[in-house]
Amino acid sequence: MTGQGSGGWQTFGERTVYDDRWVRLGLVDVRAPNGERWEYHVVHLARIAVALLVDDTDRVLMLRRYRFIPGQWGYELLGGLVEDGEEPAATAAREAAEESGWAPVGEPTKLVGFEPLPGNVTAPTEVYLWREFDRIGEPTDTEEVGTVEWVPLSRMTDLAARGELLGAGTLVAVLYYLASRPCGGPGSNRQPDGL
């Protein structure tokens, strides 16, 4: 890769240092725009799909849980790794049902796609919005231990400021959704244009 579209960066190949189902670590042979050449560490994570379920009283379905890596409690949206051959929206719907016992209904609106750490990590993330869903039972995913809660949108900026919205998928999704809504003040249940 070279030229204007690559910002002057050139890549000459990548060798894998570690690889499993969850993560692949590679060393990419690169030349920077300043002419220096070296092996750059790149972490490749699986594609991720996130479900944002918002009810008609402006509450968001979330999982309150403890994450041992940062050592903290907080709120997360539902979602997970996109399986081979699975569409991201289907992943988000499946994960929501497994983790919460609430199944999204109908076609979602794709809210946003992003790379959370583009400096040295690939983790393509897509967020889907549903405004309709059915209670189908208890959560079935035994690895996702936490409490399922409907959290008012009006609490989201405070939770974000306190660092209690865990993970980029949750933070980006919630703040994007809030920023996309027409001005209606706290508690407004008007939807973003086209949603």
Predicted regions and their residues:
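Short beta-strand micro-motifs in enzyme catalytic cores
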Residues: 24-28, 73, 124-128
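Cationic, low-complexity basic patches in intrinsically disordered or flexible, solvent-exposed regions
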Residues: 192
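Unchanged
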Residues: 38, 45-50, 55, 80-169
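A glycine-rich, hydrophobic loop/mini-helix early in the fold
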Residues: 47-72, 76
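Acidic, metal-coordinating catalytic segment for phosphate/diphosphate chemistry
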Residues: 9-50, 56
